[in-house]
Amino acid sequence: LAVSLAVAHAAAISRGVLLYNHIADIAQPQEKCLPMPMLNVLNGGKHADGSTDIQESMIIPIGATSFAQAIQMSAEIFTELKYTLKGKKYATTVGDEGGFAPHIKRGNAEAFGLLLEAIQNAGYAPGQDVSLAVDVAASELFKDNRYIFESEHKKYDSDTLTEWYKKMITTYPIISIEDGLAEDDWEGWQHLHASLPSTQLVGDDLLVTNTERLQYAIENNAANAILIKPNQIGTLTETIRAIQLAKHNGWNTIVSH
């Protein structure tokens, strides 16, 4: 990857253009749009011992009209989340990725409730101004053909976990689920996609920015969005190919940030 990026920098310099313009010339995007950040404000799973089973609980400022406003809204909510946690006697220590990592007492759903409270306290409307997203990192929870939610002392198979997701998205404004099932649970992913057709279902561990795995997922209706990480596939060219393949098939692309 280092060599690939160095070549891209050198090519941009030799052409006398900025790097992002050089990459755009290679990728030939069909449309231009401002990025919508997804901010990891509650850490769990492998990123925070003793917190939620879900690895990342995120906020998405969907009502923002500019990137600057999106960051401002998110910062306000993050500050309110700290006050919300303190008000409930939870610690405000942080996990590996900078989000709060409280020892939630009543399971994963309580974390979503805390986020809604923080959003409202910041003066925003959940589901209108700000929505939620999760990175379950389900491969880390998968043992002996079951998904183990230790904080709730529960075990799920792919079907019952899908039902739990359905319940959560009807109760909370969750619009995106990343790695909701294990990376090789292809049948489970197909069922998840069929069950939640309006939810963004993101493959990270499932797809690893690999066009072969992405093509298989597309052909088998196993997800509808891909997380893009150049370090997973190893070159800028292969990264661009993955983005192009996803967009050509109507998938959303999320550049890891």
Regions found by a protein language model. Give the residues of each.
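Hydrophobic alpha-helical hairpins/lids featuring a short glycine-rich hinge
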Residues: 1-43, 47
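Generic structural signal for well-ordered, non-membrane alpha-helical segments
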Residues: 4, 12-15, 67-74, 78, ...
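Hydrophobic alpha-helical packing residues
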Residues: 7, 74-81, 85, 115, ...
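Anion (oxyanion) recognition and catalysis
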Residues: 13-16, 86, 247
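Short glycine/serine/threonine/alanine-rich loop segments
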Residues: 17, 90, 251
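Mobile "lid/hinge" segments at catalytic clefts and subdomain interfaces of large enzymes
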Residues: 28, 32-95
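Active-site-proximal beta-alpha loop/turn segments in soluble metabolic enzymes
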Residues: 56-67, 91-108, 137-152
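Catalytic core of soluble alpha/beta enzymes
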Residues: 109-257
